[in-house]
Design a protein with these regions (language model features):
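Short hydrophobic alpha-helical segments enriched in small aliphatic residues
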Residues: 3, 30, 42, 47, ...
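Extended, well-ordered protein cores
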Residues: 70-338, 347-570, 575, 579-597, ...
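A glycine-biased, small/acidic residue-tolerant capping/turn segment at secondary-structure junctions
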Residues: 769-786
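Short, charged, amphipathic alpha-helical segments
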Residues: 751-759
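Tryptophan (W) side chains
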Residues: 19-25
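Leucine-biased recognition of intrinsically disordered, low-complexity hydrophobic segments
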Residues: 6, 32-34, 39-40
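C-terminal accessory extensions/subdomains outside the catalytic/core fold
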Residues: 788-810
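Residue-identity detector for glycine
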Residues: 10, 15, 38, 49-51, ...
Length: 810
């Protein structure tokens, strides 16, 4: 979602070059460079939709796909994504390319944005000029090769409302995409629905993550947090905030696990009460040593749990809130979310059941779907329903709010409250969430499944007993996470089903032998997960490596009462024998015990490495960084790919839609690109190690120096108009990086080149800052949300003519 103005390649760098908008300084230079390399040919003008407006992502820097990535020039692939990080890339990428070009390193972009993935999935509906390559598939294949060097920015993991909104936006821009067929019946409709469904949820990360996760706060970031502590809400010993979870009928209580003795495959079947057999998934290949497990969530027990906790919140006079991850867990969690909507608004749904069915209300899309559907009714009928909605709010406990001013509740949109962001934010804010009046209140936070709810409960209990953490003294908790090859729950989407009728769900192997079986009722959610042996071995190795490098305790967060974790404990204990662990502290604790152990160490200013599965990797790399650093976006997130390449993720946070909202309304982008700075330094260092490119190593070292100075000088974006924002932070990175290169003596040529840039930027600092500040304080039109207009967005994100000219002059 940034303008790098190169060809939009097809199978052989075919397609239209967007001459109409992108002949900027950067476009010209990079275009000429690619043409010299024989990668680009002049073609017809680009069209956006059926009109002549430019395509928002059409100008992405695309190099060769697969074998087409240059073999002569070391290449870093930089992902074009969504929302705030994508806006930031319009400003940052020209700076990055200015520096890396000097080292003979190519930085090429790949469009894996939500809109880009939609367009790539439906080429037959688009004109030749509108078609885009399947960049995600390209990167997925590349991630399995030793030469992979990918910088991955946060992207939208689309909920159904987000997917529908993106489709409508693209259609309005002239892309003749098919509507999403919610009630697909014909084979063609089913095919379209299947393609769209593959785009939902976390469709990107499982493809790219061909390695396990190493996430930690760099020393410079930790020192910055201690010198410039973020706000932390005070905790009261009388706080009524609690984490509530089910005691039976959940995934945790029904889990069964098996480790495969040999390679083979399994089939998932539903057996109805009358004996009818329906194949849910015909064939799932499995490897020797692979851990598979299956579990079921009772819909009836889930609804009873919600009802009990809503009543508990009413009695205790606290907010009620629901914390799931409907984006990542795109099959199970929207169903669980919809169940909460039906229970909370039970009187409304009972009264209008027939009407809501006629309107096509889908509770999996949240209560916002009700409001959207009734908006089309006659005024009197709509007013009557709205009166009944108000009556629900009077009789039920108050819902936590996403946006009090706009009346957006916790139950409005599934993607608005994501557990790994919402729970740390509440814990940081005295354990409280916002009510209807915009004030903070204690909450009953519902996390239905027991697998990981206890981690948050321990954290709440610890803060209530010991008070809030002090960022100036608290320790650090880096993470080693098992995630390669779609490990565990985050790879379960294609093996998750809502049960069509009472009966059984069973798993049988290729010989017809029973592997698992669960008794089920209609509406229950059944799922199967996998964790392959090679990633588990690599995970254990990475844990030992990090423990040895730091000298800190490494704690495996595994529950001896959970069948899946028992299998992992057995494997981890076996594979630890393959490594020298002398002098290391390596522990195995249940998630609750591990949380307590870690929290106690952090309070004392000590450190502990969390070694976790895929879900806790996700949760903890938000929880602890938000408490330590104020944000998870400042984490160094490295994925050593199992075949030798490197994936460098920018922080651990999301794509910050509220930042985009503020930018559009006020011309101020508060996105912090420090995660990108850190990832780029690590990427350059990896590239230098693989290729022997000394200039890449010099760029990495000087970027590290620039990052440290950037933090020490406190040039990160603030929050309000009139203060430094994302664009200003990029200017200071460029200034400090150029200055570091000008000060070094290892490469006289680079020293001389960047001394000129450093002088120009330094001499014009006040002018550049003024030009950037002048762009703030007024609404910005970027021509779209999921696929904004590149010319408008580039203009908004690069408003300093002086800075642009200085970069061009280099």
């Amino acid at each position: 979602m940034f303008v790098a103005a190169l060809s939009r390649p097809g199978a052989s760098v075919s397609g239209a070059f967007p001459w109409s908008w992108c002949w900027t300084w950067k476009a010209r230079n990079v275009f000429l460079a690619l043409r010299e390399r024989g990668l680009l040919h002049r073609q017809k003008p680009c069209e956006r939709g059926s009109g002549n407006a430019s395509s928002a992502h059409a100008g992405m820097t695309h190099g060769r796909i697969g074998k087409r990535v240059s073999t002569k020039t070391p290449t870093i692939l930089y992902t074009a994504t969504d929302e705030a990080p994508a806006l930031a890339t319009y400003s940052l990428l020209p700076i990055v390319e200015t520096f890396t070009k000097a080292a003979g390193v190519a930085v090429e972009a790949r469009d894996i944005s939500l809109s880009g993935r939609i367009l790539a999935s439906f080429p037959e509906f688009l004109s030749d000029a509108q078609r885009v390559p399947d960049a995600l598939s390209e990167l997925g294949a590349l991630a399995k090769t030793p030469g992979a060097n990918i910088i991955k920015l946060p992207n939208v993991s689309a909920s159904m409302p987000q997917l529908i909104a993106a489709i409508k936006e693209l259609q309005a821009q002239g892309y003749k995409l098919p509507d999403y067929p919610a009630d697909a019946k014909a084979p063609e409709e089913k095919g379209i629905k299947t393609r769209y469904d593959k785009i939902k949820g976390s469709a990107v990360n499982p493809v790219l993550r061909e390695g396990n996760s190493d996430r930690r706060a760099p020393l410079s970031v930790k020192q910055y947090a201690r010198k410039h502590p973020h706000s932390m809400g005070a905790w009261s010993k009388t706080s009524k905030t609690r984490i509530s979870h089910m005691d039976e009928g959940d995934f945790y209580g029904s889990e069964k696990s098996v480790t495969m003795d040999a390679a083979g495959f399994v089939r998932i079947e539903h057996i109805a009460a009358d004996g009818t057999v329906t194949v849910l998934k015909e064939k799932t290949p499995l490897l020797a040593g692979e851990v598979i497990d299956a579990s079921v969530m009772s819909y009836r027990a889930l609804a009873a749990f919600y009802a009990a906790q809503i009543e508990e919140a009413r009695k205790n006079k606290v907010l009620v809130s629901l914390h799931l991850k409907a984006t990542m867990m795109k099959v199970s969690d929207p169903i669980m979310f919809g169940c909460a909507v039906e229970v909370y608004y039970k009187d409304l749904f009972a009264k209008y059941a027939a009407l809501f069915a006629e309107l096509g209300v889908d509770v999996r899309n949240g209560f916002g779907d009700v409001e959207a559907k009734i908006a089309k009714l006659p005024p009197e009928q709509k007013a009557a329903i709205e009166a009944d909605i108000k009556a629900v709010y009077k009789s039920q406990p108050e819902l936590a709010m996403v946006n009090s001013d706009k009346g957006i509740t916790n139950l409005h949109v599934p993607s608005d409250i994501i557990i790994d962001a919402s729970m740390p934010a509440a814990i940081r804010t005295s354990g409280q969430m916002y009510g209807w009046d915009g004030k903070l209140y204690d909450t009953n936070a519902m996390i239905p499944d027991r697998c990981y709810a206890g981690v948050y409960q321990e954290t709440v209990r610890f803060c209530r007993e010991n008070g809030a953490f002090d960022p100036t003294t608290m320790g650090s908790c880096p993470n080693v996470g098992l995630m390669a090859q779609s490990a565990e729950e985050y790879g379960s989407h294609d093996k998750t089903f809502q049960v069509p009728s009472d009966g059984k769900v069973r798993v049988v192997d290729q010989d017809g032998k029973l592997v698992f079986e669960h008794a089920v009722e209609k509406g229950d959610i059944w799922r199967m997960c996998q964790a392959k042996d090679a990633p588990i071995r690599d995970w254990v190795k990475l844990a030992v490596t990090r423990a040895r490098a730091t000298g800190w305790p490494a704690v495996f967060w595994l529950d001896p009462k959970r069948p899946h974790d028992v299998a992992l404990i057995k494997k981890a204990e076996t594979y630890l024998k393959d490594h020298d662990t002398s002098g290391l502290t390596i522990l195995f604790k249940s998630p609750e015990e591990a949380a307590r152990y870690t929290l106690e160490r952090l309070k004392k200013g000590e450190n502990a490495i969390s070694v976790t599965g895929n879900v806790l990797r996700d949760y903890l790399t938000d929880l602890f960084p938000i408490l330590e650093l104020g944000t998870s976006a400042k984490m160094l997130s490295i994925v050593p790919l199992m075949n030798g390449g490197g994936l460098f993720e920018t922080g651990a946070g999301g794509s910050a839609p509220k930042h985009v909202q503020q930018f559009v309304e006020e011309g101020y982008l508060r996105w912090d690109s420090l995660g990108e700075f850190l990832a780029l330094a690590a990427s350059l260092e990896h590239l230098a190690g693989v290729t022997g490119n000394k200039r890449a190593k010099l760029l990495a070292d000087t970027l590290d120096q620039a990052n440290a100075r950037f933090l020490e000088s406190d040039k990160s974006p603030k929050r309000k108009v009139g203060e430094i924002d994302n664009r200003g932070s990029h200017f200071y990175l460029a200034l400090y990086w150029a200055d570091a290169l000008a000060q070094q003596n290892d490469d006289p040529e680079l020293k001389a080149r960047f001394a000129k840039l450093a002088k120009v930027l330094g001499d014009n600092e006040a002018k550049i800052v003024a030009e950037l500040a002048a762009a703030q304080g007024k609404p910005v039109d970027i021509g779209g949300y999921y696929r904004p207009d590149p010319a408008k967005t580039e203009k908004a994100m690069r408003p300093s003519a002086t800075l642009n000219a200085a970069l061009l002059a280099l």
